[in-house]
Amino acid sequence: QTCALPISIAINSYYTRAKELSAIGLTVEARKEIQQLEKSIRKNLTGVLWLSNIYHKAGGYSESLKLLQLYKDFATKSGERTLSPRFWKYFFPLAYREAVTSNSKYRKVDPFFVNGIIRQESLFDSKALSPAGARGLMQIMPATGKKLYPKTKLKKPFEADVLFQPDLNIRLGVKYVSQLNKRFGGNGTHILISYNAGPHVLKKWLKRFGHLNDLDVFIESIPYPETRRYVKHVLRNRGIYNTLYSPS
């Protein structure tokens, strides 16, 4: 069911303009109007859920997720224990679905694993830029992108900012995941450690903790707190995507 449109939004000029701009395909301009609308209703649960849906339709996935997190926080504080499947599908969207699906199929990589990485890396913000310089949806470092880029057979020379292009970023990111997948025999934990901290770091940790057969114990033994959290969150994301979208 569609979340009812609050009257305060229906008569809001920002909403009217956003709807008109979205209808003619001007999604970037529509999102700017929505951002102005957000300021006036961000603490209204019904409005937040409704607005996150509009962000989603306009391609504003990261904005939608931030609003949904706000909704989730308010719902928890107000004693709401369960959230609808509709909420969770917006909270874990199949954003950039065609690019993720086609590249994952070609590289024989689990698309839910890729979705889990993108959600954790950038919250589906194609313009995301880390302090270290990682760019785009899958937060690819320029040095890594430059190594992967020749395999695309694109004629234009590589520039770091091409990593902000969603389709190309996913193409290169999935290629890199595929390389790690082959290198580490499909071990998701090892792939994620390598993706986050580097293969050389994984090699060092395997010498120290490789004897630990229990996966949870091994993950808890990861020395870098950031990498430990990253691995847990991406594996959780992958599990939720599988639960929400797997045909079985």
How would you describe each model-predicted region?
Residues I11:
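Primarily a LysM-type cell-wall glycan-binding module
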